[in-house]
A protein has these predicted regions:
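C-terminal structural segment of proteins
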Residues: 1-287
Length: 287
């Protein structure tokens, strides 16, 4: 186990030992080890890297350290900064998980049920990645999760750059009857008056958060941005249906032109869950 004192030292340690696995809170790593899915031959511990534990303000953005724990992000001072991310952090499992798990770990693991991921997608956050030799580059969170721009050998997530919107933002999730609050579906929604946009990301139902772009544009077109910005209940319901149909689509029509297969009951339930979450999120954001 290597215990570097700075981010650049950690990157150098990873570059020197390509098989090493970085570890901060270790919540996902230990689960993989206990399940027999991972047997790391070397670890690079990030617990002493103080520069990635806090946050700072920079040009209308918050620069969040990758070592921020969910427990820290759930506190009131952080909630005043980025309410949806704080709500997601508070929902991230039992206290022992929130106390250990980190923002950077949530992103790097990329588990579909990661609560912070749809929030970061809806906020259009970017990553500041540390590279060997002291280099830095920026990567869109959505591009990383979609596999369009992956971390390279020896790289580590240093910070997450999040726009400070001062705009309504909501995070909601649905959980199963068992397990430590693991999401079966989640939604993050932002109403951005400055850009006159609605941005929505659905989590936990696919390998990466899904952005229903047409539904976003449709909802934005209905809002009176210069007035009260409210929408009637039927519009909120239609938005939920629009989002759910986009994210949980109908089966394709067979090539022979026959009847498409019906959605299984579990998939229908998931679609109804997504519709309800999206409807509630937009309603709360506009209220």
């Amino acid at each position: 186990v290597t215990l570097p004192a700075s981010l650049d030292e950690a990157v150098a340690a990873l570059a020197a030992t390509p098989a090493a696995v970085p570890v901060a809170g270790g919540t996902d790593l230990m689960a993989s080890v206990n399940a027999g899915q991972l047997r790391p031959t070397a670890l690079v511990g990030l617990g002493r890297v103080r520069e990635i534990r806090g946050w700072q303000y920079l040009d209308g953005h918050a620069l969040l350290g990758a070592g921020l724990t969910h427990a820290r992000m759930g506190r009131p001072d952080f909630a005043a900064l980025i309410p949806a991310l704080a709500a997601a952090a508070r929902a991230a499992g039992p206290p022992q998980i929130r106390n250990a798990g980190t923002l950077g770990g949530n992103i790097a693991t990329g588990a579909p049920s990661g609560d912070t991921l749809p929030v970061l997608a809806a906020l259009e956050a970017t990553l500041v990645v540390a590279s060997p030799g002291g280099g830095r580059r920026e990567v869109s969170v959505s591009h990383l999760l979609a596999g369009m721009d992956m971390l390279r050998g020896g790289e580590l997530i240093g910070w997450v750059r999040v726009p400070l919107l001062h705009a309504p933002q909501i995070f909601l999730k649905a959980t199963g009857r068992t397990g430590p609050g693991r999401a079966t579906a989640s939604v993050a929604l932002v109403v951005d008056p400055a850009r006159r946009e609605v941005r929505c990301a659905i989590g936990a139902i696919a390998p990466m958060p899904l952005r229903p772009l047409e539904a976003e544009r449709w909802a934005a077109s209905l809002i009176d941005w210069d007035g009260e910005r409210g929408l009637p209940q039927e519009s909120l319901t239609a938005f939920g249906t629009y989002v759910a149909t986009a994210c949980v689509p109908d089966p394709e029509v067979p090539a022979d032109g026959g009847e498409p297969p019906k959605l299984p009951p579990a998939v229908l339930h998931l679609r109804r869950t997504v519709a309800a979450l999206a409807r509630r999120a937009l309603g709360r954001a506009l209220s």
